């Protein structure tokens, strides 16, 4: 039972694709490299960052990130270097400017328009409801007679 539990724990731990030969000797630079690798998407994998991807291009990107850091580039310069070569697709969170700005705002705008439309539709339905006509005295008397029988 203990062996199964231990095996389950080992299999459940996340596996990082960073190979030992890629790790930098400076822990500060390595931490920065891992942080940058978390925000860069693998160009050939779907929804996987380069830190966790086993694809060859991800390995090359991880090495390029580390080379740029060793050369003295800032985090932003490293990200720009990779983005210039692979396009904005490699960013998990694209920059909020230009055409991307439209994409960021279209979802909330559609939601606001839909909620406004629902509100107006419900408000219009209430107005269309006709009030129930009140019975005249003669009709009430006739109704009472019918109910007595």
Swiss-Prot record:
**InterPro entries assigned to the protein according to its UniProt record, in alphabetical order:** C-type_cytochrome_biogenesis (IPR051263), CcmH/CycL/Ccl2/NrfF_N (IPR005616), CcmH/CycL/NrfF/Ccl2_sf (IPR038297)
Q: Gene symbol? A: ccl2
Could you tell me what this protein does? Required for the biogenesis of c-type cytochromes. Possible subunit of a heme lyase.
Query: A single Pfam family, by name?
Result: CcmH
Q: What are the binding positions for heme in this chain? A: 42, 45
Secretion signal, residue range per the UniProt entry: 1-17
Supply one GO molecular-function term.
metal ion binding
The protein depicted here goes by the name: Cytochrome c-type biogenesis protein Ccl2
Q: Give the species this sequence originates from.
A: Rhodobacter capsulatus (strain ATCC BAA-309 / NBRC 16581 / SB1003)
Q: What is its main location?
A: periplasm
